[in-house]
């Protein structure tokens, strides 16, 4: 698949790049995508939830009423889960929701996500660029020139560019990531993928050497 190389002003440079079929043209594996996204979201969970069981509730252990003769159900402790303020049965406890996936599956999931984006025509290759100042207005103008101002976008860079990161930080629908940082969730969550020429070369090299 060939894509035109665009300037950040939206103009066509007249050059084209070829997307590797081993990365952007595979048969997508939906189950790999599902597992990787599930893994990413699970690893983001704090897992600090906690409720008290009846043995952890502070209170008297005195029997609250006599066993027989009241006409109501027998009750032994104010800490019982059936009473207000009592413990919770099988309540949540702190835990780690994360689980491990092998690198091969994660790699397949990222390739599948990139293939879907390429098939949908949602990948754009930009000529290498940088901003002289970290101006949000300049970043917004770039998105407007590319007709992406109202869509969720992900800009993939080969290395940290402080001005671009700061310029994009105040825009709610855009994010910036390095080639090494991209994951399946971010790729699918973003409607449009912007990638610089150098980042594309680095991405291809990383996948082929992994």
UniProtKB/Swiss-Prot annotation:
Keywords for this protein: Ribonucleoprotein, Ribosomal protein, RNA-binding, rRNA-binding
Transmembrane regions listed in the UniProt entry: none
Iron among keywords: no
GO annotation (BP), single: translation
Region feature Disordered, mapped onto this chain: 46-77
Molecular function terms, GO-annotated: rRNA binding; structural constituent of ribosome
GO cellular component terms listed in the entry, alphabetical order: ribonucleoprotein complex; ribosome
Superkingdom of origin organism: Bacteria
PANTHER family: 50S RIBOSOMAL PROTEIN L4, LARGE RIBOSOMAL SUBUNIT PROTEIN UL4M
Subunit structure: Part of the 50S ribosomal subunit.
Assigned protein family: Belongs to the universal ribosomal protein uL4 family.
Function: One of the primary rRNA binding proteins, this protein initially binds near the 5'-end of the 23S rRNA. It is important during the early stages of 50S assembly. It makes multiple contacts with different domains of the 23S rRNA in the assembled 50S subunit and ribosome.
Protein name per UniProt: Large ribosomal subunit protein uL4
């Amino acid at each position: 698949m060939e894509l035109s190389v665009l300037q950040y002003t939206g103009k066509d440079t007249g050059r084209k790049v070829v997307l590797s079929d081993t990365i952007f043209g595979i048969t997508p594996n939906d189950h790999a995508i599902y597992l990787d996204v599930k893994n990413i979201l699970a690893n983001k969970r704090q897992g600090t939830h906690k409720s008290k069981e009846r043995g952890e509730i502070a209170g008297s252990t005195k029997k609250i009423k006599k066993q027989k003769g009241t006409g109501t159900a027998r009750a032994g402790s104010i800490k019982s889960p059936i009473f207000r303020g009592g413990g919770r049965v099988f309540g949540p406890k702190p835990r780690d929701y994360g689980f491990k996936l092998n690198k091969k599956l994660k790699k397949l999931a990222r390739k599948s996500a990139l293939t879907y984006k390429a098939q949908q025509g949602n990948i754009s290759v930009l000529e290498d660029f940088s901003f002289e100042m970290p101006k949000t207005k300049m970043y917004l103008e770039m998105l407007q020139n590319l007709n992406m101002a109202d869509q969720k976008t992900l800009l993939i860079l080969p290395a940290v560019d402080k001005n671009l990161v700061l310029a994009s930080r105040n825009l709610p629908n855009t994010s910036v990531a390095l080639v090494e940082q991209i994951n399946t969730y971010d790729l699918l969550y973003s409607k449009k993928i912007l990638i610089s020429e150098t980042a594309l070369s680095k991405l291809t090299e990383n996948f082929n050497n992994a």
